[in-house]
Amino acid sequence: MAYAAYRGMKRCAEVSGVPGFIARGVSPSDGKGFYLNSSRDTFSLFVSGMLAFYRHPFADAQTRAEIAKMLVDVARYAEACVVPKNDYSLLRADGKASIVCRMWVPDPNEAPKVDATGWARVGGMMPHESLRLPMFYAAAHAVSGDARWRELELRYADDGIRIAEKPIGSNIRGSELGQLQLSVRLLWECETDAGRKARYARLLDRCADMA
């Protein structure tokens, strides 16, 4: 069952032909069709799941090599996409502007401007959003050992932690709390700095208290 899930996730990483792009899913009718726009949730769940597979006993050397390549591809894709000209967002598979894929903001100190639907479409980041990007780079570093990814992780991690530590309203969606938890858990597992690891641990405790 786990290996079947892995093969399905791997297909989502390969179907577009764009290294690092993760499709939401693949059409069961032909095994080729997919939606051009992905989402931050899709990428985050993929990265978290693939690192878990990488560390699982079922993963042989070939599987771990495949996972390492996919996670590094995601990190490269994020590095290329998450820049000012793209509104700090992951792009669609065709290279056009996306929706629900904003990964960072010009000023991490700016407060988010939340609309009537509860989304922060402009301004700063919400607590559950802020650790996705460093999580991608942490996973790439964990499987490759390439210091470049650790450097990129740390470029965003401390601001991300500070934002995640801000008060979270009781109306937070369960899916949002879950996204925060999986990002923080991956970062906590990978972190070697004692002070930063302790802050991640406190964030995990808060997620548990709110669940």
What spans do the regions from the language model cover?
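Well-ordered alpha-helical scaffold segments within catalytic/enzyme domains
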Residues: 1, 45-63, 132-146, 180-196
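Extended, well-ordered alpha-helical scaffold segments
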Residues: 1-12, 58-81, 145-164, 195-211
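Extended ligand-binding groove/face enriched in aromatic
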Residues: 1-122
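Boundary/linker segments of alpha-helical solenoid repeat arrays
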Residues: 15-20, 166-170, 211
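Extended, charged low-complexity segments
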Residues: 170, 174-211
